């Protein structure tokens, strides 16, 4: 499951804005996006990742994604870094 990938990853970037920046730098291996996040926020992340041929995984909950990242709040998007 993608929550496990995030919690076991050595290096991650949390949040949509930071994920977009990392995608533009070309340092992203995979993107994980929460289905319950606002599509207005996550659509740019998903489209940019797909344009670059980067795998996009969808998870059910922002809260669980945030917990997998080790933070107390939800996370809409997370980038797993190369």
Curated annotation (Swiss-Prot):
Q: Per the record, what is one GO cellular component? A: ribosome
Report keywords, A-Z.
Cytoplasm, Ribonucleoprotein, Ribosomal protein, RNA-binding
Knockout consequence? None; has no effect on viability, growth or sporulation at low, normal or elevated temperatures.
Where does this polypeptide localize?
Cytoplasm
Its subunit composition reads:
Found associated with the 50S subunit of the ribosome during exponential growth but not during stationary phase.
State the HAMAP family in the record.
Ribosomal_eL8_Bact
Protein known as: RNA-binding protein YbxF
Organism, scientific name: Bacillus subtilis (strain 168)
């Amino acid at each position: 499951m993608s929550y496990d990938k995030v919690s076991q990853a050595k290096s991650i970037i949390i949040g949509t804005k930071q994920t977009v920046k990392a995608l533009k730098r070309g340092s992203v291996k995979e993107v994980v996006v929460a289905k319950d996040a606002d599509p207005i926020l996550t659509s740019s992340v998903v489209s940019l990742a797909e344009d670059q041929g980067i795998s996009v995984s969808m998870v059910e909950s922002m809260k669980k994604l945030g917990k997998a990242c080790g933070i107390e709040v939800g996370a809409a998007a997370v980038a797993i870094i190369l």
